Amino acid sequence: MKLLGAPASPFARKVRVLALELGLDLPLETVATATSVELPLANPLAKIPTLLRDDGPPIYDSPVICDYLNALAGGALVPASGEARWRALTLEALADGLCDAAVWRRGEMLRPEVEQNAAALAKQAAVVERALDALEAQVETFTSFGVGEIAAACAVAYLDFRFAAEPWRPTRPKLAAGYARVSERASMKATTPD
């Protein structure tokens, strides 16, 4: 079993952190989405992360991979049912949406400035701000470290990595404190991108 992804991808990092927390060995094979021959054969969407299994067809996207790995390991990082499951998956969706907006912004900002869509950049920046505010409002979730908290930690870590000039901590002290605690976990340290 191996994960096709990139060290800087917050979605691949979420999967890698979850795998480490579950005690699973999940090698990362770094692929370039634009040029990889293997990726579109495994995932017709040609998106990362994609999980290549030894005993079945590939699995994608990151929420499905996390659910699969949790089931494979008999873990409790993705609750099986009830309100706890819906809360965890909703928190994961919030963090993933933040990442979607941030990754899109990063790609757009790599284009020549005259070709950038300023209105779309502003819209996605607003999505990030609203998501951060929502995380601040529910930061008590960092008292545990399940799939939702892992996704949230990887999302704000991505902002630190790609948008260091846009500090999010000053107006979100509870989120900052919660993230400071979980960022010390071995799984987070082992997956920090260069």
Whereabouts are the PLM-identified features?
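GST-like domain detector, emphasizing the conserved glutathione-binding G-site
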Residues: M1-A119
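Hydrophobic/aromatic-lined pockets within catalytic cores
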Residues: N70-G74, D160, A164, S183, ...
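GST-like fold's C-terminal all-alpha helical module
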Residues: A95-A180
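Charged/polar, low-hydrophobicity segments characteristic of intrinsically disordered regions
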Residues: A137, V182-D194
